[in-house]
Each structure stands twice: as C-alpha cells, then as structure tokens.
Amino acid sequence: MSMEFDAVIIGGGVSGCATFYTLSEYSSLKRVAIVEKCSKLAQISSSAKANSQTIHDGSIETNYTPEKAKKVRLSAYKTRQYALNKGLQNEVIFETQKMAIGVGDEECEFMKKRYESFKEIFVGLEEFDKQKIKELEPNVILGANGIDRHENIIGHGYQKDWSTMNFAKLSENFVEEALKLKPNNQVFLNFKVKKIEKRNDTYAVISEDAEEVYAKFVLVNAGSYALPLAQSMGYGLDLGCLPVAGSFYFVPDLLRGKVYTVQNPKLPFAAVHGDPDAVIKGKTRIGPTALTMPKLERNKCWLKGISLELLKMDLNKDVFKIAFDLMSDKEIRNYVFKNMVFELPVIGKRKFLKDAQKIIPSLSLEDLEYAHGFGEVRPQVLDRTKRKLELGEKKICTHKGITFNMTPSPGATSCLQNALVDSQEIAAYLGESFELERFYKDLSPEELEN
C-alpha cells in the first residue's frame, strides 16, 4: 500500500472529516488521507458527549452580532443541508423547537431589540411572550409550587427546526461517502502524530510508532493539538492557548427543545443552556460550565494528561499579562471562580442549581446529576503580540503547503464552510480543480444566486 498522498489531514474530528469529504466530492485530487490518534473517528471534541449537539446558526445565540449571525447562518445551512440531502434525519440530524429567553426586565428589553434585528436575517423567527413560552416549554415558566415564576420573560426562536446534530455520526458519514467516491483514499487510526518534517517538496507525517505518510499538502485539524504542532515547525510562535473545559449536568427530561439564555457580552463563553440529549434518551443537559485547566484534552483524573506542550506555549510573560488583565475584570474573575466551584463535589452541584433554575425554576438539588465523562477542552487562542484573548476560530496559513486550524465552537457547525475554504486552498496550491458552483448548488443555493 502506497503511503504517498496529495493531501493528508491530521485530525479525524468533524472538521477534518468534512474536508476529507469535500476534497473527495468536489476536487480533482486523486488520493487523500486522514490520520487520527484515537481508535475511532470523532472521539474527542466531536463526540456526542463533548458538545451540546447544537447546530449554532446564530438565531438563538445571543452573543452573536447581526453581522456574525449572517455568516454563521450560511455556514450552518451547509451542514444542515448535507445531512438532509443524505437522508440522515433522526440518525444524525434531529428536529426540535428552540428558543432564547430573557429573564427579568433588563434582559427582556435586550431580547425585544434583538428580535427586531434578527427577524430580518432568520426567516420565520418567532417572538414568544410568557404565555407562549409556557405553552411550548411549561417547565421554563412553572415554579416548584406549580405557580408561574414572577419574573418578566420574553423569547424568540422556532417551534420546529433541524437544530440538533450528532457530530460524531456526521463525521463517520463524511468518511463513508469520501471512501466511496475515491477508493484510493485512506484512513489511519491509532496514528498519533509525533512530528511533521519537510522533505524537498513533500511533507512526512511521522507517528509516535515511527510510521510515516507523505503528502504534498498537510492540513492540521487537530483541535487543541494544532498550535503545538505549528510551533514545533516554527509557526504561530506569537500565540498562546487558554484551554477551557466545559462540563454538563443532567436533569430529568423536563425540556421539549433547546432553551438558551442571554450571554454576558464580556464573557467569551456560552451562557448556560438546556438541551434534550440526542443520544441518552430521557435526559436533558444543562451547561456548559467553563473551567480553565492546564490540559489540551480532558481526562477523568485531574492530574492525568497535564500538557507539557501547553506549558511550553504559555510559560512566558505575555501570556501571564493576558491572564492578569482578564482576571483584573471583576465580572470575569467572579465567573472564573464560580465555575471552579461548580466542579467541586457536593458544593458544586448546590452552587450550579441557581444557574440551572434560570431555565427550569422548579429544579431541586436531587434533580441535578453531574455528567461524568461529558464535556471537552476548547482551545481559546491568546495573541501574545496584541496581548489579548482571540475569540472564535484561528487559522495559520503558511502558504508553503501546510495549514493549521484551531476551531473552537462553533467549529462543528461551520465544518463544511471551513472545509470549503481549506479545500479551495489545497486545490489551488496543488494546481488541481475545485467545483465551487456544484458545491454551492448542493449545499448553499442561496449563495449561488447571490
């Protein structure tokens, strides 16, 4: 078996698998490979346990500006449309209602203004008053005593929407389709990359077991590990990493759909939301919490997996200065300490209850169950030159046949949009063709019309 490929993708999560499919379906590349360190695809951030299983299209994510929502909506549409085109309903993609709610007069005023801006972007977006919310999500309004909660509440969303996705199953489907299209493609599992070497006009991707695969172009979609790999080759040395781990709590099956809350604009992390679990039936997830930790990947044991790569990246005065500036803000500092408490046995559950009751006011301590083994690390990029936290996705384009992607949320939602960008770059670099018009025709006709 030849180990030489046109392109090798490092990372078998949903982003890497989406690019594997996109190159196979729409480009003239002959052979593409994925190398993945786990024994199965999509076992880390793309696992159904690691994320909220949400297609983040911007309609109920209150931290998105209208400008960002317009872009994210188109990205989300591609992922949704792929699943519907392939007939993956109720296997990969699921239909539920979804809403964002404002609780209290200040948040309600914000939600009213937001609706006026966002109804032009999202066709069919409905505004919900307190009575309508009670009809759609009775447990959001009813208190423990069976009486409606006293706060003013308003929201908007959809009574029915393809809003939930199992990104691990989607990853598997991408790969199945790609292998059908190009039988010479290859997937290498249990291939943990140790280093990447440039050898003339080819890259050698070398595993810890001394296996080697070769490519004219390497795309690193390795989540938290992308930046250490980049820095090992001399790229991205002006960047650091703030790993933020999210955890969830389970509650009984008390929500019919997704319920999101208003996010503090100062905080780069999602506000607590409720999501019926698409994999574990009869459970609703409340979360995520946000805990910084010195690890690139979450493990059950706190001391297991502390990352030497991370220490190399972050043990410098610029990163400490960014951290100090962040912690100097009272709201951010309180948020960080509160989320540290959420992880503590016994007391954490008691403290988290108040946040969860914003969504389901009747919740009791007995209803909450810490979701062990759920949640994963999201790498937040630190710009050491600008001395600030960079929100969203980060890409290092070397223009030398290797690109590094760091894709925190909503990277899974945007996987096909990111795959489009990367596939075009790869095809252009290799002098191959890419069928952009057919891509849009299949997955985003709206953009083709515009």
Curated annotation (Swiss-Prot):
Its cofactor is FAD. Pathway: Carbohydrate metabolism; tricarboxylic acid cycle; oxaloacetate from (S)-malate (quinone route): step 1/1. GO terms for cellular component: cytoplasm. InterPro entries: FAD/NAD-bd_sf, MQO. SUPFAM superfamilies: FAD/NAD(P)-binding domain. GO terms for biological process: tricarboxylic acid cycle. It catalyses: (S)-malate + a quinone = a quinol + oxaloacetate. Gene3D superfamilies: D-Amino Acid Oxidase, subunit A, domain 2 (3.30.9.10), FAD/NAD(P)-binding domain (3.50.50.60). It is an enzyme of class 1 (oxidoreductase). Its EC number is 1.1.5.4. The keyword Cytoplasm does not apply. GO terms for molecular function: 2-hydroxyglutarate dehydrogenase activity; L-malate dehydrogenase (quinone) activity. Keywords: FAD, Flavoprotein, Oxidoreductase, Tricarboxylic acid cycle. It comes from the Bacteria. Belongs to the MQO family. This is Probable malate:quinone oxidoreductase.
